[in-house]
Amino acid sequence: MFPALQKIVVSTNASPLVGRELASNSTWIWHVERLPMLLGIPTVILSLTPAVLRLLIKPLLFVPIRYSSFVLTRLITPVLKEDMLEFESTADKKSPAGPKAKGKLALTSWLLSRYPASLKDRMSQLIRDYLAITFESTPSTSGVLFYILIELAAAPELAEAVRRELREVAPNGELPSTHLNELKVMDSVMRESARVNPFSHLVLYRKLLRPLKLEGCPELPAGCFICVDAHHIDFSPQLWENPERFDGLRHYRARQKPENGNRFKFANLGSDAPGWGDGPQACPGRMFADNTIKIILAHILTHYDLELPPGQGKPEKGSMPNGSMSPDTKAKVLFRSRKL
């Protein structure tokens, strides 16, 4: 299921970022969905290679990702040129720009208005920024969506509860962006899945630029890496009742209290939700990811029933050497079309 979800996420992300034409372009989708592996595999190989050999093999290992970057650059350049012409013809360069009629966000205008005047090659910088955004938004969103669907496939009654909410919020089958915040049951399922199946066991990596003394600890030297243990926050019995159990309505119930109306949301920051980071370094794309996942879930749950194959439980969780999630790419979920 995971490879199929990656294609869906790439296409859904691309529509508001680079336009619907590229969102349905098979070449764009093919290269974007491979970027994480084209970067990850050479990085792991280099980490296991003796330092004296790294300079020799590094150029060869990164040939595939350089080629994919070349292809993606060729595809996106005409889109960015059109965006730049539109930006230059706008009288007020600092005015916030909303989504265009064709559904594409004015991300280019937003970036251009914030680039320093001293920047000479704005096109090259735009391409780098767009490819970085495209790369960062693909594996994390796909992984989170993978585990949400696994949990829903294992709990058909929970999936039906989300469908009931969808029928109430979007009775005519239309779901405008203004209604996404009303999907409180869906949001609770998303947050609970992210708690039980976190994107990473370790978060907020920092490299110390000078020695640091923490209370109760020896002095940490400059150059040392520190991080936050997200795993023991997500599974803390002081924060969560029965933390080992997946409870899709856990956060929905918590939000029924008046004082919690704006708490316990999927995209919220806080000491009990370490996955997004915190402060000025918190994930800037978390609201975009929130909307993307809700749109995809709404479509899937409206049009399909899903369940795990007979005799198969939830797939085992894997993790990368850095603690990031590693979904089971061979896991299967059964989909059956629903009568609308």
From Swiss-Prot:
One of its GO terms (biological process) is secondary metabolic process. It is a single-pass membrane protein. The lineage of its organism: Eukaryota, Fungi, Dikarya, Ascomycota, Pezizomycotina. It comes from Chaetomium globosum (strain ATCC 6205 / CBS 148.51 / DSM 1962 / NBRC 6347 / NRRL 1970) (Soil fungus). Signal peptide: none annotated. Heme binds at C283. Gene3D superfamilies: Cytochrome P450. Disruption phenotype: Impairs the production of chaetoglobosin A but leads to the accumulation of prochaetoglobosin IV. Belongs to the cytochrome P450 family. The chain crosses the membrane at residues 37-57. This is Cytochrome P450 monooxygenase cheG. GO terms for molecular function: heme binding; iron ion binding; monooxygenase activity; oxidoreductase activity, acting on paired donors, with incorporation or reduction of molecular oxygen. Its cofactor is heme. Induction: Expression is positively regulated by the cluster-specific transcription factor cheR that binds directly to an asymmetric direct repeat present in the promoter. Pathway: Secondary metabolite biosynthesis. Residues 308-340 are annotated as: Disordered. It is an enzyme of class 1 (oxidoreductase). It is found in: Membrane. SUPFAM superfamilies: Cytochrome P450. Its EC number is 1.-.-.-. Glycans are attached at N25, N322. Pfam families: p450. One of its GO terms (cellular component) is membrane.
